[in-house]
């Protein structure tokens, strides 16, 4: 490793990543044909990924200077001793995107004998298709660091650290017209889609005696599957006794003749369903500025912006020419789901000893779900000893914390402290309807319809924004107004060590809220002779509704704890 890497250019200096491209494709087609049925399976798997390969500058010491811009993108500049990076233009230390995509499709088609066994079978066609897809954009950050020395970052124009790390064994000094230490965002998209359709002719033999035979057969099969022989024998004996009891009950109820307890059922029907799901998740990746010694951040003409990131050192000093903004980043999630299904059938049944009966039936259902959530990631500025901040204009702490054993602040205009509320909403709507008409020996009309709904909302402060002083207290001077919205200025020190001077003081509480509403309503129609009294004719079926809400308050504080 060289002892020092000096580099000077009158033009831009770019320390950039390379990208590896990986791609994979798998396809399968398989068809199996039997005497009475066939099955075709198609599989499609595809994925691709762009993998970041970082550039690395590593030496005993590093000194980089540019007459224009310096850009460190998805790469690393590290040294045992001091690292100095100076740009006469802009200085950007930032993350880069690493993209990946995948898609999986499986389709299964069946025809002929779809199911059999017992005393029935179905002949027809069936198709099922499942699809999964993902598109991800992740961030790979840069690192500028010194193991035993200091890191000095200077820009005549803007200095930006985005989704990256600056680390030093000693001090970190960052200077620019405008200084930003902010998060980057990774985005994850996922989709699912499922489809099913089945059409066929079903034939079955039913009746009380048939049920006994089927139950006995199932008991024998269960007994054969049991590993313990004694337990298997007991299962078989129980099955025999249950069958004998069922036959006696049938005879006792006047069903002594076998032909009076047999029926032949034939139906032609179709059923189909479809469901989809789409989700997008955004995850914030914090920048980290951490020093074993002091951290000094200075903007010479404009603002200092800390967004969803962390700054830590022995003593931490912010000196903003204009505004000091310490704000939160946020993670978001959005999910949309939908589903629908329908079925229809025409059937005929002949029960020996009675006349034929016919039936027509159909049903449908539809559902939708929408969910959205936002969570905030506070910026944290931590001084193990003294924390000092100064702004020529406003100091805005909105989704952030400043903490130190002693906190000193000088604000040229307003000091605004505001806590952020995480939020979540969930909405669900469901509809369904069905009807059946019986003709012949089993005349009846029945039907039902229902509508259901869920609506849930939530807002709450998870982390309270503010200024936290240790046993040395705080000394804060604000020229115009101090405004607290669910904010806090707190200290562990005695009262005489805590001082705050402001032109005016305004404050506002933040209400945490949670509410939940759910309800359903339906109607039933049943004209069958066996309909229960409560459902005879046309009756409403009112679902049990639910409603609840809760509130709490985040109050501003300015006190000694």
Region locations from a protein language model:
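Binding/recognition "hotspot" determinant
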Residues: 1-561
